[in-house]
Amino acid sequence: MSATTSGTASAAELAKFSAMADAWWDPEGDFKPLHKFNPVRIAFLRDHFAAHFGRDIEAPRPFEGLSLLDIGCGGGLLCEPFARLGFAVTGIDAAERNIGTASVHAERAGLPLTYRCAMPEDLVAEGKTFDAVLTMEVVEHVADVRLFLDSVGQLCRPGGAVGAATLNRTLKSLALAKVGAEYVLRWLPRGTHDWRKFMKPSELTAGLREAGLSVDAIAGMTFDPFSGTWSQTTDVSVNYMLFATRAAA
């Protein structure tokens, strides 16, 4: 790896998240915000995947027979729930320590997950494809957004679907997600995010379209400081999620 980047990975971002690897599964640790809004992310993705693939979410393992790739999986906070829902899950991350953390936790949980220290373009080069691809809270950390999104598109099979989430680049997100979360509330370590790398929904939609995908749904996430909970909203001015699909062959 060079001093700054390798493919879509940024060396500075890798160092930052590697240093926090052991905290992934601590609900009160560095990744507390992810634990807090994980149920909202899972519900959004589960419901849209079920509608797209024609699956019954009331079934014990509704996505049995389908494969899912989680890009930038970190410690596996999304991989494990989707494995329990029946997906054959592969999680990749450019930080080796994250993969170690995720693998140990999955083994302890008795879940048959596949984890690899790799970047999406590595899997593209191997000719891998998946029914579902996730890139949740990742695109704002990559070095080459265009290459990254192109890889996401290539990894999604015809007839497949992609779930994406990031932060909007607005003054509100600067105040809340950057200054508020990192410096005032100290939910995140200082320097976790670079506001300049946040993406507007129109920018992410355009990038996914160029990668051969069609955005079918968008939703925001909002935090209620009184209840301490997150919920889905139509307001996409800070955190937002997208659901995109690739046309069947």
Swiss-Prot record:
CDD domains: AdoMet_MTases
Taxonomic superkingdom: Bacteria
Uppermost EC category: transferase
UniProt xrefs under Gene3D superfamilies: Vaccinia Virus protein VP39
Keywords of the record: Methyltransferase, S-adenosyl-L-methionine, Transferase, Ubiquinone biosynthesis
Residues involved in S-adenosyl-L-methionine binding: 41, 72, 93, 136
GO biological process, one term: methylation
Pathway: Cofactor biosynthesis; ubiquinone biosynthesis
Catalysed reactions, as listed in the record: a 3-demethylubiquinol + S-adenosyl-L-methionine = a ubiquinol + S-adenosyl-L-homocysteine + H(+); a 3-(all-trans-polyprenyl)benzene-1,2-diol + S-adenosyl-L-methionine = a 2-methoxy-6-(all-trans-polyprenyl)phenol + S-adenosyl-L-homocysteine + H(+)
Pfam annotation, one family: Methyltransf_23
Protein EC: 2.1.1.222, 2.1.1.64
Role: O-methyltransferase that catalyzes the 2 O-methylation steps in the ubiquinone biosynthetic pathway.
Record-stated family: Belongs to the methyltransferase superfamily. UbiG/COQ3 family.
Protein name, per record: Ubiquinone biosynthesis O-methyltransferase
Source species of the chain: Rhodospirillum rubrum (strain ATCC 11170 / ATH 1.1.1 / DSM 467 / LMG 4362 / NCIMB 8255 / S1)
Name of the gene this protein is made from: ubiG
